[in-house]
Amino acid sequence: MTHVRDMDEADIEAVSRIRVRGWQAAYAGLVPGTHLDAMTVEDDAARRRQWFSRPGRTSRDLVAVADGRGPVGWLCYGPPPAGAPDPAGSGEVYALYVAPDLIGTGVGRRLLEEAHHRMRAEGFTASALWVLAGNERALRFYERSGYEADGRTQDDVYDEVTLTELRYRRPL
């Protein structure tokens, strides 16, 4: 049985492990291997501790917890980044990762449904997120969850390779 709750500081190591392993599994063949190989749980956890304890942080973190296993998924959401040209009332899912051995078991869906529920309760009327072009599994997942590409793109550079992200949106 898996349930979703707010992330707390004790979850940081598990969330970093989920995020790093998630990147390495989901982005193999898309993001340069040198970048993926350089990722470590320890470095991610150190950055996450700083970020998690930042005063005035407006993002929210959720974890999916499996009985007897601890956190097996993580989602972070909140308002669009400062300066983003989003309509009033829009929120953004910044990240969603599931332990690679549990992808396709409903953990990600439960996290996303809970995030949508909380976003509506916080007054958001729409949700946006960014998906790496070519990440077909993620694109199918978000499309099944009611998201549609809105035509916006942004580029990120990983080890001198430019990759494009596509923005997806859905009403809440």
Which positions does each model-derived feature cover?
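C-terminal "cap" of GNAT-fold acetyltransferases
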Residues: 90-91, 125-140, 144-172
